[in-house]
Amino acid sequence: MDTSSYIFWDMSPDMFSLGPITIRWYGVFFALSFLCGLYLMTKVFEHEKKPEDDINYLFYYMIAGTVIGARLGHCFFYEPDYYLAHPAEIIKVWHGGLASHGGVLGILTAVYFYSRSRPEQSLAWVLDRITLPAMLGAGLIRLGNLFNSEIIGIPTDVSWAFIFARVDLLPRHPVQLYESIVYFLIFGFLMLAYWKWDWGKQRGLLLGTILTSVFSARFLLEFFKTRQADYGHDLPLSVGQWLSIPAVIIGVLLIFQSVKQAQLEKTS
């Protein structure tokens, strides 16, 4: 096979080293996602005249929920046999292994506990607004996956295929880039929806939009990925696709309910 026409990807996952300390690209993108998220939520709280001191508390809840949820999601959604046999490995986040579906569940749990401590900021109110930083963060983290040469696509002969030198010499779909681009586009749409179209006033509309769009895209893009779970290879759909279906259904229901509520308010 002539591979000269494809993109040869041999990027080191390490950004640089300072003595015994190594800074990895994935870690930089992960940290950047939270810093950008903190900035965005600060602007949202200023816009809606909420206590700025609450931003730090929400930030801590979000970090804990994202990391714990994403880690547990990877361990039990994708490699349950291994981690049940080696439970001590679960806490070794630095070895890699985070799942976006688990991250979503972790964020939902974290926001639930945060909103209970802030009665004036309901669960629905917070969830609608964290869609903005969540979507930007998702796009950045997928770039981190690209630098790690992980979550790779299936072999292909398309002209833009990547050869991940740290994996093999097969041209593959750069599915990390596909997802990242889609997530950045959804982020741009949500920014318009919140700042220009004022969708934040319709409870559940932003959250429903992100669940429907993100997990519909995720369902479709899974067809271009190699299977990540250590089971279910004989099933027609991947684990990621099965997990995406309920998220899409919930998103559609939230959009329907939000639009219906807005229509009732107009007629009342």
From Swiss-Prot:
It is found in: Cell inner membrane. Its main location: membrane. It is a multi-pass membrane protein. This is Phosphatidylglycerol--prolipoprotein diacylglyceryl transferase. One of its GO terms (cellular component) is plasma membrane. It comes from Chloroherpeton thalassium (strain ATCC 35110 / GB-78). Belongs to the Lgt family. GO terms for biological process: lipoprotein biosynthetic process. The gene is lgt. Its EC number is 2.5.1.145. NCBIfam families: lgt (TIGR00544). GO terms for molecular function: phosphatidylglycerol-prolipoprotein diacylglyceryl transferase activity. Keywords: Cell inner membrane, Cell membrane, Membrane, Transferase, Transmembrane, Transmembrane helix. A 1,2-diacyl-sn-glycero-3-phospho-(1'-sn-glycerol) binds at R142. The chain crosses the membrane at residues 25-45, 57-77, 93-113, 151-171, 175-195, 204-224, 236-256. InterPro entries: Lgt. Catalyzes the transfer of the diacylglyceryl group from phosphatidylglycerol to the sulfhydryl group of the N-terminal cysteine of a prolipoprotein, the first step in the formation of mature lipoproteins. Pathway: Protein modification; lipoprotein biosynthesis (diacylglyceryl transfer).
